[in-house]
């Protein structure tokens, strides 16, 4: 993320989450897992008026948490002014909103001071005493939900994954299928 001055937006999900704006960076793909930074860049070149727009970072307000002046202004304008402050790398303070098509949900488990991460195909109960569908109802819809975040599966591999709170090392629970799929990446963390 530090190597570029421009990120890309994605507003494809605004038909069902009107106030949600995805900001896609080289180290953070779209929540759905379908768009990465290069996809956003290519989509803009193909359709300059489409849902993927370049967003200059501008001056850093808090680079550690992933907050930049111009990103905040863009998100505010494109979220119908419902979101004024936005941190890319924190899910506790002013996290990115979620639409509803995210692959995974991560949330704080207060009893462990850790984080649990669950994949959308997992039908069982999580340690938060909620199933994925209940968590999705809490997180989705384009509202900031401190302590909860929707994200792509590959974002877990990123060094920017909830880095303001300690990153993937804070994960204390994952459903088995996700853990097995992510095992090679998690071993390197």
Regions found by a protein language model. Give the residues of each.
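Cysteine-centered metal-binding/redox modules
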Residues: 1-189
């Amino acid at each position: 993320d530090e190597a570029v001055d421009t990120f890309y937006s994605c507003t494809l999900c605004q038909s069902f989450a009107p106030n949600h704006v995805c900001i896609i960076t080289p180290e953070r793909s779209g929540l759905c897992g379908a768009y990465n930074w290069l996809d956003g860049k290519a989509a803009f070149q193909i359709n300059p008026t489409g849902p993927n727009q370049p967003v200059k970072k501008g001056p850093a307000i808090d680079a550690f948490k992933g907050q930049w002046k111009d990103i905040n202004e863009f998100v505010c304008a494109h979220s119908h002014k419902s979101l004024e402050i936005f941190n890319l790398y924190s899910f506790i303070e002013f996290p990115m909103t979620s639409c509803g098509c995210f692959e995974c949900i991560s949330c704080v488990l207060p009893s462990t001071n850790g984080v649990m991460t669950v994949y959308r195909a997992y039908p069982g109960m999580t340690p938060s005493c909620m199933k994925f569908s209940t968590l999705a109802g809490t997180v989705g819809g384009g509202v900031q939900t401190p302590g909860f975040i929707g994200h792509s599966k590959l974002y877990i591999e990123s060094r920017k994954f909830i880095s303001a709170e300690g990153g993937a090392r804070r994960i204390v629970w994952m459903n088995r299928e996700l853990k097995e799929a992510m095992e090679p990446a998690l071993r390197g963390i």
